[in-house]
Amino acid sequence: MTTLKQDAICSIVVNIIRCLQCIHSLGFVHCDIKPGNILLDKEGNAVLGDLGLARQYTTSRRLVDKNNKRYGTLTYLSGDVHARVLPTRRSDMESLGWTIVELFGGKLPWRGLKYINTIETLKKEVDVTIFDDRVASYLLLVRATGYNDEPKYNEMLKIFAKDKPS
């Protein structure tokens, strides 16, 4: 596996945050953010692939998923999806956070576990400050986002801006 430089990772993250901002502005959530769905073009620009689970989101209230379905890949699921409520913009941003942990070479404490309840508990209880400072800042920002709130995209982008010192 090729290791990416920090600048390249930050550039990828910025591109994906912008992709999600665009998807969200159209009233949709991706629902399956993970490293395997991040594609790079010849110039190294990142885009999101596999929109097969994408769905419209609601901002009216916290809605229980009547289908009792979990949308996405277990390792990267958001707390909302674990709780069986419909995914929102926050859900995508949290899933991106778990993806960013791995892009920066971190290990998710639940990686390889198969018990959904154990994974859900670990995600709720994980001390995000164990990760890279940028990743921790990002995850804290996501955790501060309300279920129906618009993510603070500009603040998230600033965390990974090129002129930010490592």
Residue ranges and their predicted role:
Residues 12-13:
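Activation segment signature within eukaryotic-like protein kinase domains
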Residues 24-41:
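Catalytic-loop of the protein kinase fold
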Residues 41-71:
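Activation segment/activation loop of eukaryotic-type protein kinase catalytic domains
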Residues 80-90:
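Conserved end of the kinase activation segment
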Residues 99-107:
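Short conserved helix-turn element in protein kinase catalytic domains
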Residues 144-166:
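Terminal C-lobe "cap" of eukaryotic-type protein kinase domains
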